[in-house]
Amino acid sequence: MKKLLFALILLCTISTLGLAHHSFAMYDQTKTITLTGKLTRFVLGANHAQLLFDLLGPDGKQQLDSNGKPIVWGVETGSAKQLAGAAVTVETFPYGTIFTVSLWQLRDGRNFGAMSLNGGRLIGCGTTFPQGGCNEKTGKVYLNGRDNPANDARRQGP
C-alpha cells in the first residue's frame, strides 16, 4: 500500500511539473499586441519554434533603442510540425522576411512573447515593406489563430 501511495504522489508531482512547463502564465494574456519586424533568426525546436526579428515602425523603418542599436523582439510559436502544416518553413520565411505577428508579451516587459492562440496572426509580406504596411491585405496569412490548419488537423483526430 505504501508503494502504491508513493507511486501516486510521484506521478502527481511529475505531471504538475509537466503542466507548469506548458503554462502560458508568464505571458500577459489579457493584452494582445501586434508587431511588424524583419526576421533575423528562425529557431526550429521539437516543441516550439522561435522567430527573432528587428522591430519595424509603421513606416517600415528599423526601430532603434537609445544607444542606436536595433530593437530586437522574439515570438514563440507552435512546434515545427505545426508550422510546416501551415506552410511556415525556413523556405517560406527566410532571413530578411518582413512579417506581422500578434502576440502576448512577457509579463516582465521584456521584448518576447507567445503567439496568441485566440485571434493571433502571422502574416508574411516578403522582403520589402509593402505600401500600407504588412497586413492581411498586403501579405499572406500563414497562421490565423483558430483557423490554423495545424489546429484543424488536431481537432479532427485520426
Regions found by a protein language model. Give the residues of each.
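Bacterial N-terminal signal peptides
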Residues: 6-16
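Short nucleic-acid-contacting surface segments enriched for D/E, G, S/T with interspersed K/R
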Residues: 84-101
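Short aromatic-glycine-enriched beta-strand elements
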Residues: 45-59
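Positively charged n-region of N-terminal signal peptides that target proteins for export
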Residues: 1-4
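Conserved hydrophobic positions within beta-strands
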Residues: 37-39, 98
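Short boundary/loop segments of OB/S1/cold-shock single-stranded nucleic-acid-binding domains
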Residues: 18-33
